[in-house]
Amino acid sequence: MPGRIEDYALISDRLAAALVGRDGSIDWLCFPRFDSDAVFAALLGSRDNGHWTVAPRSGGTCTSRRYRGDTMVLETEWATDQGTVRVIDFMPERDEAPDVVRIVEGVDGAVDMRSELRLRFSYGDVVPWVRHLDGMLAAIAGPDAVWLASDVPHHGRDFASFADFTVEAGERRTFVLTWNPSFRHRPQPVDPLRALDETERFWSTWAAHCSYDGPYRDAVVRSLLTLKALTYAPTGGIVAAATTSLPEQLGGPRNWD
């Protein structure tokens, strides 16, 4: 079952956007643009409609969830019986191909983690053909291809890709999900740590232009960042919502988000 809408956080590269649940699952992502078909659509259905979860294998408690400073870089921490782990989620500013980057950091102890990648194209209707190619995982469906580059090996099961791994204090594991037209050669994945630094710098530099210094400045800046994240970069148009088909009121007709 999808989470409550208030439990989702937005990440964006100003050409597309994803919703990340408090449980570590990306349940909504239209790739490569806001108006493209979704490759993760569990938000509107079930997990089988597509999601990508990176979280402690045995559960745990989400103890902290925040954006890093004045950015759209999301940071989530879990406390488990084995220790504490942090997951950083963001979408780098677009270079040639769109990316979703997830970085797992060990804070203390040694925490068993799991990545479950269940790609479903066309809003959950199409199960892609998945194979390992050139050290990456490739999921292809018609004209679309999504590639996963990671330092953690994945294996297939039940039409999904899984990775079980352990992260110790001070260690990092990285995941880069990239869209590309299926007729092109595989994309060159971004360097996750460099992309993190550049993404934080982009958002914080932009937010620093806000001259408002009155009450609730943090809330004002966060609202501006959210609007910027929903602004389609090539035209400056603001999308009505990052999602679709969520009712303004349950049972009512206002379902355009």
What is each of the regions a protein language model found here?
Residues 1-257:
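Acidic, mature catalytic/reactive cores of soluble proteins
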